[in-house]
A protein has these predicted regions:
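Alpha-helical transmembrane segments of multipass membrane proteins
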Residues: 47-48, 90, 105-109, 171-175, ...
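Hydrophobic alpha-helical transmembrane segments in multi-pass membrane proteins
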Residues: 3-7, 37-38, 42, 46, ...
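Hydrophobic transmembrane alpha-helices that form the pore/transport pathway of multi-pass ion
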Residues: 26-92, 98, 102
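Helix-coil boundary and interhelical linker segments in multi-pass alpha-helical membrane proteins
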Residues: 107-123
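Flexible loop linkers connecting adjacent transmembrane helices
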Residues: 20-31, 66-70, 111, 142-153
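Core transmembrane alpha-helical segments of multi-pass membrane transporters/permeases
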Residues: 1-21, 212, 216-241
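Long, contiguous bundles of hydrophobic transmembrane helices that form the permeation core
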Residues: 119-235
Length: 241
Protein backbone atom coordinates (compact mmCIF):
# COMPACT_ATOMS: atom_id res chain seq x y z
CA UNK A 1 0.00 0.00 0.00
CA UNK A 2 1.84 3.04 -1.29
CA UNK A 3 0.39 5.65 1.08
CA UNK A 4 1.27 3.83 4.33
CA UNK A 5 4.66 5.53 4.30
CA UNK A 6 3.03 8.97 4.19
CA UNK A 7 1.06 8.25 7.36
CA UNK A 8 4.14 6.86 9.12
CA UNK A 9 6.05 9.96 8.01
CA UNK A 10 3.34 12.29 9.30
CA UNK A 11 3.41 10.70 12.75
CA UNK A 12 7.21 10.67 12.89
CA UNK A 13 7.58 14.36 11.97
CA UNK A 14 4.86 15.39 14.43
CA UNK A 15 6.48 13.37 17.21
CA UNK A 16 9.95 14.74 16.45
CA UNK A 17 8.55 18.28 16.54
CA UNK A 18 7.36 17.66 20.10
CA UNK A 19 3.84 16.37 19.55
CA UNK A 20 4.40 13.21 21.59
CA UNK A 21 5.68 15.12 24.63
CA UNK A 22 2.80 17.57 24.30
CA UNK A 23 0.19 14.79 24.42
CA UNK A 24 1.85 13.28 27.51
CA UNK A 25 1.84 16.61 29.36
CA UNK A 26 -1.75 17.25 28.30
CA UNK A 27 -2.83 13.84 29.60
CA UNK A 28 -1.26 14.46 33.02
CA UNK A 29 -2.82 17.93 33.15
CA UNK A 30 -6.26 16.45 32.44
CA UNK A 31 -6.36 13.38 34.70
CA UNK A 32 -3.23 13.49 36.87
CA UNK A 33 -5.17 14.57 39.99
CA UNK A 34 -7.68 11.71 39.78
CA UNK A 35 -7.40 8.58 41.88
CA UNK A 36 -4.78 6.46 40.15
CA UNK A 37 -3.93 9.51 38.07
CA UNK A 38 -0.58 8.25 36.73
CA UNK A 39 -2.15 5.10 35.26
CA UNK A 40 -5.07 7.03 33.78
CA UNK A 41 -2.68 9.64 32.38
CA UNK A 42 -0.63 6.85 30.78
CA UNK A 43 -3.77 5.45 29.13
CA UNK A 44 -4.87 8.87 27.88
CA UNK A 45 -1.36 9.74 26.69
CA UNK A 46 -1.14 6.50 24.71
CA UNK A 47 -4.57 7.15 23.22
CA UNK A 48 -3.59 10.65 22.16
CA UNK A 49 -0.29 9.39 20.79
CA UNK A 50 -2.30 6.77 18.90
CA UNK A 51 -3.82 9.64 16.92
CA UNK A 52 -0.45 10.21 15.24
CA UNK A 53 1.19 6.78 15.48
CA UNK A 54 0.00 3.43 14.17
CA UNK A 55 2.89 1.57 15.81
CA UNK A 56 2.32 0.03 19.24
CA UNK A 57 6.09 -0.29 19.75
CA UNK A 58 6.72 3.39 18.97
CA UNK A 59 3.79 4.35 21.18
CA UNK A 60 5.15 2.31 24.10
CA UNK A 61 8.63 3.78 23.74
CA UNK A 62 7.36 7.36 23.39
CA UNK A 63 5.00 7.33 26.37
CA UNK A 64 6.26 4.41 28.47
CA UNK A 65 9.70 5.84 29.22
CA UNK A 66 7.94 8.73 30.95
CA UNK A 67 4.77 7.18 32.38
CA UNK A 68 5.98 3.83 33.74
CA UNK A 69 8.42 5.33 36.31
CA UNK A 70 5.68 7.71 37.52
CA UNK A 71 3.19 4.83 37.84
CA UNK A 72 5.73 2.83 39.87
CA UNK A 73 6.48 5.84 42.05
CA UNK A 74 2.77 6.24 42.82
CA UNK A 75 2.63 2.69 44.20
CA UNK A 76 1.55 0.62 41.21
CA UNK A 77 3.57 -2.64 40.97
CA UNK A 78 6.10 -2.69 38.12
CA UNK A 79 4.34 -5.55 36.33
CA UNK A 80 0.99 -3.76 36.39
CA UNK A 81 2.56 -0.46 35.35
CA UNK A 82 4.07 -2.19 32.33
CA UNK A 83 0.79 -3.96 31.58
CA UNK A 84 -1.16 -0.68 31.63
CA UNK A 85 1.27 0.98 29.23
CA UNK A 86 1.42 -1.96 26.82
CA UNK A 87 -2.36 -2.41 26.74
CA UNK A 88 -2.92 1.31 26.11
CA UNK A 89 -0.20 1.48 23.44
CA UNK A 90 -1.44 -1.61 21.58
CA UNK A 91 -4.91 -0.08 21.49
CA UNK A 92 -3.33 2.94 19.82
CA UNK A 93 -3.17 0.87 16.63
CA UNK A 94 -6.96 1.04 16.29
CA UNK A 95 -7.23 4.74 17.13
CA UNK A 96 -8.03 6.85 14.03
CA UNK A 97 -6.99 8.78 12.03
CA UNK A 98 -3.57 7.06 11.84
CA UNK A 99 -3.97 3.35 12.53
CA UNK A 100 -1.77 0.28 12.25
CA UNK A 101 -0.56 -1.08 8.93
CA UNK A 102 -3.31 -3.73 9.01
CA UNK A 103 -5.93 -0.99 8.53
CA UNK A 104 -4.36 0.08 5.23
CA UNK A 105 -4.03 -3.52 4.06
CA UNK A 106 -7.65 -4.13 5.05
CA UNK A 107 -8.82 -1.17 2.97
CA UNK A 108 -6.94 -2.38 -0.11
CA UNK A 109 -7.85 -6.07 0.14
CA UNK A 110 -11.54 -5.38 0.77
CA UNK A 111 -11.71 -2.69 -1.88
CA UNK A 112 -13.07 -0.06 0.52
CA UNK A 113 -11.81 3.42 1.29
CA UNK A 114 -9.57 4.18 4.25
CA UNK A 115 -12.27 6.65 5.30
CA UNK A 116 -14.67 3.72 5.77
CA UNK A 117 -12.15 1.86 7.92
CA UNK A 118 -11.45 4.74 10.30
CA UNK A 119 -15.11 5.71 10.72
CA UNK A 120 -15.96 2.14 11.75
CA UNK A 121 -12.91 1.92 14.02
CA UNK A 122 -13.52 5.11 16.01
CA UNK A 123 -16.26 3.85 18.36
CA UNK A 124 -14.54 0.52 19.23
CA UNK A 125 -11.32 2.45 19.90
CA UNK A 126 -13.06 4.84 22.30
CA UNK A 127 -14.83 1.95 24.07
CA UNK A 128 -11.54 0.10 24.51
CA UNK A 129 -9.96 3.11 26.21
CA UNK A 130 -13.01 3.61 28.44
CA UNK A 131 -12.62 -0.03 29.51
CA UNK A 132 -8.93 0.52 30.29
CA UNK A 133 -9.82 3.61 32.33
CA UNK A 134 -12.38 1.60 34.31
CA UNK A 135 -9.97 -1.26 34.98
CA UNK A 136 -7.20 1.12 36.07
CA UNK A 137 -9.65 2.87 38.42
CA UNK A 138 -10.61 -0.43 40.06
CA UNK A 139 -6.92 -1.34 40.51
CA UNK A 140 -6.23 2.10 41.97
CA UNK A 141 -9.05 1.72 44.49
CA UNK A 142 -7.86 -1.77 45.43
CA UNK A 143 -4.26 -0.61 45.90
CA UNK A 144 -5.27 2.77 47.39
CA UNK A 145 -3.30 4.75 44.81
CA UNK A 146 -3.96 8.46 44.93
CA UNK A 147 -3.56 11.12 42.29
CA UNK A 148 -0.44 13.18 41.79
CA UNK A 149 0.15 16.23 44.01
CA UNK A 150 -0.75 19.61 42.53
CA UNK A 151 2.91 20.61 42.34
CA UNK A 152 3.67 17.76 39.91
CA UNK A 153 0.79 18.46 37.53
CA UNK A 154 1.23 20.94 34.67
CA UNK A 155 -1.47 23.65 34.48
CA UNK A 156 -4.17 22.60 32.02
CA UNK A 157 -4.78 25.89 30.24
CA UNK A 158 -1.12 26.74 29.76
CA UNK A 159 -0.31 23.19 28.69
CA UNK A 160 -3.11 23.04 26.13
CA UNK A 161 -2.22 26.39 24.57
CA UNK A 162 1.51 25.63 24.51
CA UNK A 163 1.06 22.98 21.84
CA UNK A 164 -2.24 23.82 20.20
CA UNK A 165 -0.39 24.16 16.89
CA UNK A 166 0.24 20.39 16.99
CA UNK A 167 -3.51 19.85 16.65
CA UNK A 168 -3.80 21.87 13.43
CA UNK A 169 -2.27 19.23 11.08
CA UNK A 170 -4.38 16.51 12.74
CA UNK A 171 -7.51 18.64 12.26
CA UNK A 172 -6.58 19.19 8.61
CA UNK A 173 -6.10 15.44 8.11
CA UNK A 174 -9.43 14.58 9.71
CA UNK A 175 -11.22 17.37 7.82
CA UNK A 176 -9.86 16.31 4.44
CA UNK A 177 -10.66 12.63 5.11
CA UNK A 178 -14.08 12.93 6.73
CA UNK A 179 -15.56 16.15 5.34
CA UNK A 180 -13.95 16.68 1.94
CA UNK A 181 -13.63 12.91 1.36
CA UNK A 182 -10.17 13.23 -0.19
CA UNK A 183 -8.15 10.10 -0.81
CA UNK A 184 -5.99 9.05 2.12
CA UNK A 185 -2.78 9.77 0.20
CA UNK A 186 -3.81 13.31 -0.76
CA UNK A 187 -5.13 14.13 2.72
CA UNK A 188 -2.01 13.05 4.56
CA UNK A 189 0.28 14.65 1.94
CA UNK A 190 -1.22 18.10 2.50
CA UNK A 191 -1.28 17.50 6.25
CA UNK A 192 2.47 16.85 6.13
CA UNK A 193 3.01 20.06 4.16
CA UNK A 194 0.99 22.05 6.71
CA UNK A 195 2.99 20.46 9.53
CA UNK A 196 6.28 21.43 7.91
CA UNK A 197 5.11 25.03 7.47
CA UNK A 198 4.01 25.16 11.12
CA UNK A 199 7.40 23.86 12.30
CA UNK A 200 9.30 26.44 10.25
CA UNK A 201 7.07 29.33 11.34
CA UNK A 202 7.28 28.25 14.99
CA UNK A 203 11.08 28.15 14.97
CA UNK A 204 11.40 31.51 13.17
CA UNK A 205 9.05 33.15 15.68
CA UNK A 206 10.91 31.51 18.59
CA UNK A 207 14.21 32.87 17.26
CA UNK A 208 12.80 36.40 16.87
CA UNK A 209 11.39 36.23 20.41
CA UNK A 210 14.91 35.50 21.70
CA UNK A 211 16.36 38.31 19.55
CA UNK A 212 18.20 35.77 17.41
CA UNK A 213 18.49 35.60 13.65
CA UNK A 214 15.31 34.34 11.94
CA UNK A 215 17.56 32.41 9.55
CA UNK A 216 18.95 30.51 12.52
CA UNK A 217 15.43 29.54 13.51
CA UNK A 218 14.68 28.56 9.92
CA UNK A 219 17.77 26.36 9.84
CA UNK A 220 16.79 24.72 13.13
CA UNK A 221 13.29 24.05 11.77
CA UNK A 222 14.70 22.48 8.60
CA UNK A 223 16.96 20.23 10.69
CA UNK A 224 13.94 19.25 12.79
CA UNK A 225 12.02 18.27 9.65
CA UNK A 226 14.99 16.27 8.35
CA UNK A 227 15.20 14.43 11.69
CA UNK A 228 11.49 13.62 11.36
CA UNK A 229 11.99 12.31 7.83
CA UNK A 230 14.81 10.07 9.05
CA UNK A 231 12.68 8.78 11.92
CA UNK A 232 9.81 8.10 9.53
CA UNK A 233 12.08 6.07 7.25
CA UNK A 234 13.34 4.04 10.21
CA UNK A 235 9.80 3.44 11.51
CA UNK A 236 8.72 2.30 8.04
CA UNK A 237 11.24 -0.55 8.16
CA UNK A 238 9.21 -2.29 10.88
CA UNK A 239 6.00 -1.83 8.88
CA UNK A 240 7.61 -3.15 5.69
CA UNK A 241 8.95 -6.22 7.46
Amino acid sequence: VSFIFLFVLFGAILDTAGGGKYFINLAFALVGKMRGGPAKAAILASGLTGLISGSSVANTVTTGTFTIPIMKKSGLPAVKAGAVEVAASVNGQIMPPIMGAAAFVMAELLGISYFTVITHAFLPAVISYIALFYISHLESVKLNIRGLPESEIPPLGKTFLSGIHYLIPIFILVYLLLIERWTAASAVFYSILSLMVIILVREVLAAKKKNLSPFGGLKFGINEIIAGLEKGAINMINVAI
